């Protein structure tokens, strides 16, 4: 559903931000 799509996009966004910030350690 829409919720799962948003959740997936959010996780991808966090990964992208982490790479941009210099590879911050994962949380969750």
UniProtKB/Swiss-Prot annotation:
Keyword line: Antibiotic, Antimicrobial, Cytolysis, Fungicide, Hemolysis, Secreted
Annotated TM spans: none
GO cellular component, one term: extracellular region
Subcellular location: Secreted
Tissue: Expressed by the skin glands.
One GO BP annotation of this record: defense response to fungus
Protein function: Peptide CPF-B1: Has antimicrobial activity against Gram-negative bacteria E.coli ATCC 25922 (MIC=5 uM) and multidrug-resistant A.baumannii (MIC=4-8 uM), against Gram-positive bacteria S.aureus ATCC 25923 (MIC=5 uM) and methicillin-resistant S.aureus and against fungus C.albicans ATCC 90028 (MIC=25 uM). Has some hemolytic activity against human erythrocytes at high concentrations.
Membership in a protein family: Belongs to the gastrin/cholecystokinin family.
Name the record gives this protein: Caerulein precursor fragment B1
Organism: Xenopus borealis (Kenyan clawed frog)
Organism lineage string: Eukaryota, Metazoa, Chordata, Craniata, Vertebrata
